[in-house]
Amino acid sequence: MGRDTIAEIITSIRNADMDRKRVVRIASTNITENIVQILLREGFIENVRKHREKNKYFLVLTLRHRRNRKRPYRNILNLKRISRPGLRIYSNYQRIPRILGGMGIVILSTSRGIMTDREARLEGIGGEILCYIW
């Protein structure tokens, strides 16, 4: 049985965010690098750096936490895996769902690479819905 690297990075980021950790380390692959670049561009994480350890590459992510008056930290990341190896979910560009009325993002794998729902609508292409982030 194969590994689902997208589910692994989503779970790692979600667990680190709930545990109020500032830094999380994930395995580096082409897919994870593209997803992390989208998270960085959309402002969900602060910083990314590539780290090499014994011929393996890792991405070290710095998570963004917001201060709240009542509680010291507020969890800002909600990530949900949609298409998985056992059940692939595809959508054309007209039926890509809007998360929280456009406040969240949908990450898609298209024929032109991994992109957000806004980019896919602008280019007029659909693809496999990887995850929701809000």
Swiss-Prot record:
Cell location: Plastid, Chloroplast
Gene Ontology CC annotations of this record: chloroplast; ribonucleoprotein complex; ribosome
Keywords, sorted A to Z: Chloroplast, Plastid, Ribonucleoprotein, Ribosomal protein, RNA-binding, rRNA-binding
Main location: plastid
InterPro entries listed in its UniProt record: Ribosomal_uS8 (IPR000630), Ribosomal_uS8_CS (IPR047863), Ribosomal_uS8_sf (IPR035987)
Molecular function, one GO term: rRNA binding
Protein role: One of the primary rRNA binding proteins, it binds directly to 16S rRNA central domain where it helps coordinate assembly of the platform of the 30S subunit.
Family named by the database record: Belongs to the universal ribosomal protein uS8 family.
The name this protein goes by in its record: Small ribosomal subunit protein uS8c
Source species: Nicotiana tabacum (Common tobacco)
Taxonomic lineage: Eukaryota, Viridiplantae, Streptophyta, Embryophyta, Tracheophyta
Gene name of this polypeptide: rps8
